[in-house]
């Protein structure tokens, strides 16, 4: 079997181009501008970079990007209230709470509060249940990306 080198940067660039076209199509045909809300609690350096890059990529694709940076000492109830607010916000189509969250918060409770239809990580039990059952559903980004790259090569 021959070895092939996968150029992930080139693949990602082409994928972002296709996404931008799809977003423009939504805007022109349906007057919809997708919106991604990202919530970061605390100031973990790796999470800061991830959130910053996610915002840049979202905007470059022509989508609305909403960032909510909450202090480390934010209560779990306040974070859950923010998630509820985003669940009902019609301009937000997807919600990503950046993990890990501070130790005083229960990650699973936060995951379950996000509406399955807005859970871009695919971690809600409804979404992961569909995936585990072999039913069509949202696949988390990292495995989807790895699978997509490997199938094209």
Question: Where are the model-predicted features located?
Answer:
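Short, solvent-exposed amphipathic alpha-helices that sit
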Residues: 22, 49-61
């Amino acid at each position: 079997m021959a070895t092939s080198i996968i150029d992930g940067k080139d693949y990602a660039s082409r994928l972002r181009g296709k996404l931008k076209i799809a977003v423009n199509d939504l805007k022109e045909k349906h007057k919809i501008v997708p919106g991604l809300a990202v919530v970061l609690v605390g100031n973990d350096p790796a999470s800061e970079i991830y959130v910053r890059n996610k915002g840049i990529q979202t905007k470059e694709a022509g989508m609305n990007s909403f960032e909510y940076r909450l202090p480390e000492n934010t209560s779990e109830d306040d974070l859950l209230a923010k998630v509820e607010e985003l669940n009902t916000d019609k301009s937000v189509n997807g919600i990503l709470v950046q993990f890990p969250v501070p130790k005083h918060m229960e990650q699973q409770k936060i995951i379950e509060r996000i509406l399955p239809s807005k859970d871009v990580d695919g971690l809600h039990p409804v979404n992961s249940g569909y995936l585990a059952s072999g039913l069509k559903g949202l696949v988390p980004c990292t495995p989807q990306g790895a699978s997509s790259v490997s199938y094209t090569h």
